[in-house]
């Protein structure tokens, strides 16, 4: 939740908000030895009741790949991974606010405050009539302007006040944070391409079994971690992907306490075993395994400068498409997707999971955060950059006549209160979903 809490008038604040990060990308079917069309962030399948997960596995994981995470729950894990995720989020906030700040300063527009975080001031200093501060909660930031500040000795008709500047100047200032995040996202992806390369995936037939729960039906009947299920009840699982995982889960669900025939590949051996699913509380079958598509991942590096820009461009536009598509799906299916809207606690939890599982994944985590922040802020809603832009464009349509100050402040105040309420709700909801909090309750 990124809010502007500047003491400057509401009409000249530039607040920011993050949402819909729990599921930032769309699911595309895996392709053999292709660039990933989406983020390295794993997306949980719809079969969480059976511990199945559509997850990418990398050679440079920090922890074993069979670490589980339940759908709708978050686990911060190690302090190191939390700090890494928090640092990424803070850096993105700094970039966004710096975009606004530079756009104003380079045009000679007066700026009174530059803050990272909100709440009580931890440290501050003044330079060139600007107060720079670090605040207690580094999950937001703002750039403050002295417009209509009763304590300011600047004349109200000063041409260098933001409110007195031409429409184009104000549009540049308000949109600069969004532009900065988009540029930063591309720079992150470009750095990833140059430094570690892009992930490629190679698909194999069957469904991988990363983990088998102790004392489960699968454990009792001989299924082991690392096994690959090639067929279920005579149906070949020729393609690797979420469809194959769904086939296995569906057969298991339909056959509680009835034999299910699995053809298994274990190392160089191939054989059949019969598993009898246990009956769960809802009457469906379960065998107590974690499942994932049978894919392996490697890295591809560009061979020359043109290929570097080509790789970075394709990855950037692919991630951008996924972010926009996710936002569209959120609005079109809000009743189903509302639970996936996330606040800063969930974002850091997801980032910590990425950092813990795969250090390289932080590149795309950061790029996705930048793109999400840019897109969300562009929405024409009060308290967002897009809302401020909408008011400026309305002024242009009205021939340069501004809305009455009381009306403008009323619109922005209602938007800020809504965002504050939603932010507090998300923080509480996401905090209650943390694993260690659930264990305490």
From Swiss-Prot:
Enzyme class, spelled out: hydrolase
Keyword Calcium belongs to the record: no
GO molecular function per UniProt: metal ion binding; metalloendopeptidase activity
Presequence range in chain numbering: 1-84
An example Gene Ontology CC term for this record: chloroplast
InterPro entries: PDZ, PDZ_6, PDZ_sf, Pept_M50_Zn, Peptidase_M50
Keywords of the record: Chloroplast, Hydrolase, Membrane, Metal-binding, Metalloprotease, Plastid, Plastid inner membrane, Protease, Transit peptide, Transmembrane, Transmembrane helix, Zinc
Entry EC number(s): 3.4.24.-
Binding-site residues, Zn(2+): 96, 100
Subcellular localization, as worded in the UniProt entry: Plastid, Chloroplast inner membrane
Bilayer topology term: Multi-pass membrane protein
Recorded superkingdom: Eukaryota
Segments passing through the bilayer: 171-191, 373-393, 407-427
Reported cofactor(s): Zn(2+)
Domain PDZ, residue spans: 196-249
Record family assignment: Belongs to the peptidase M50A family.
Function recorded in the entry: Metalloprotease essential for chloroplast and plant development. May be involved in regulated intramembrane proteolysis (RIP).
The protein's name: Probable membrane metalloprotease ARASP2, chloroplastic
Record organism: Arabidopsis thaliana (Mouse-ear cress)
